[in-house]
Amino acid sequence: MNYLNLPKIDLHCHLDGSVRPQSVIDIALQQNITLPSNDLSEIQSLMVAPDTCLNLDEYLTRFELPLSVMQTAAGIERIAFEVFEDAAIENVKYLEVRFAPLLHLQSGLTLQQVIGSAVKGMKRAEAQHDIKGNFILSIIRNMPKDRVNEVIDAGASFINNGVVAFDLAGSELPGFCEGFIPHAKYAVEKGYRVTIHAGEQGVGQNVHDAIAMLGAERIGHGIGINAHKQAYELTKSESVALETCPTSNVQTKAVDSLSSHPFREFYKDGVLITINTDNRTVSNTTMTDEVRKVMQEFDLSREEYFEIYKVSVEHSFASDAVKQQLLALAE
C-alpha cells in the first residue's frame, strides 16, 4: 500500500514540536540568537527526542530550542507556514496545530500578535497547498492561571477564522482539571471547542474529569482509560474521540511498545480513535509514518483506515463545508 498517497487528517500536532531544524538555524542567524551550534545534525539532535525517554518531562525538554526562535512575528509566521507545508506534501488534507501563546512573549509581542502571526502563516500555506487547517490554543498546566483568560480573549477575535479550540497541555498531574473549570467554561462562552491532554501518563481519572468537569469533546492521548472503567465508559457514552499519537506514546513511556498500545482494543470496542503525530520533529515522525506503523502493527485494512479517517473528520473542529470536502476523499 502507498501510505504517502492516502489522504490524512492530523488533529494533534504541536507547533513548537514540529519545527524544521534548518529553520531554527536560519531564524537564529537573522535575529542574532546564539545557538549551541550551527551544525544541522547537532541542532537536530537537540530537537529530536530519544526513541524512549525517561518520562514525559524529558521529552518536553526538546521544545526549548525551537521556542527561542519563535518570539517574533516573522519567526512564528514562517514556522506556522512550514508545518502546514510539510504536512501538505505528505497528503495531510486537514491539520489542527496547537501551541501555547504565553510561551511566545519574550520579545515583546502581544498575545494577539502571536496568534495573528501563526494564523497568517497557516493561511499562506492554505493558499499555496492543498490543505486546510485551524489552530488550538494551549495553556501549559503548571504556569500561573492568572493569564489564562487573557489568552482566551486574545484568540476570541480569530474564532472560526483560524482558531477553533482551547487545550490544556504539559506535565500531567492527577486532579488538574478542577483548577481549570472556570477557564474552560469561559472559553466555551467565547466560542471555543474543547480538547484536553489527559490520560497520557496513565491517569484515567483525569480523562473522566476532563469530560465531566471541562466539557472536553476530544482527549489528547487518553490511553489511561484502559485501566479506568468509569473513564472508559464515559468516553464511549459521550462519543469523545481520542487523539492517539503512537510514536510519541512509546517515547514518553506511556506504553512499553507499539505492540502494547491499546489502539486496536479501543478500535474493536467502538472507542472513537484517531491517528496523529503529536510532534513531527521531536518524535521524528510524519503522518505517513504514523499511519504505516498503525496499519502494519494492528493489521488494519484500507477500509478500516478510512473508518478511522472518517472519525477524524467528524470529530475535527473544521467547518461543515471543509468536513464535506474531506469526507469526499474517503474511498
UniProtKB/Swiss-Prot annotation:
It catalyses: adenosine + H2O + H(+) = inosine + NH4(+); 2'-deoxyadenosine + H2O + H(+) = 2'-deoxyinosine + NH4(+). Substrate binds at residues 14, 16, 170. Binds 1 zinc ion per subunit. Its cofactor is Zn(2+). It is an enzyme of class 3 (hydrolase). The keyword Zinc applies. Coiled coil: none annotated. GO terms for molecular function: 2'-deoxyadenosine deaminase activity; adenosine deaminase activity; zinc ion binding. The active site is at residue 200. The keyword Lipid biosynthesis does not apply. GO terms for cellular component: cytosol. Catalyzes the hydrolytic deamination of adenosine and 2-deoxyadenosine. Belongs to the metallo-dependent hydrolases superfamily. Adenosine and AMP deaminases family. Adenosine deaminase subfamily. This is Adenosine deaminase.
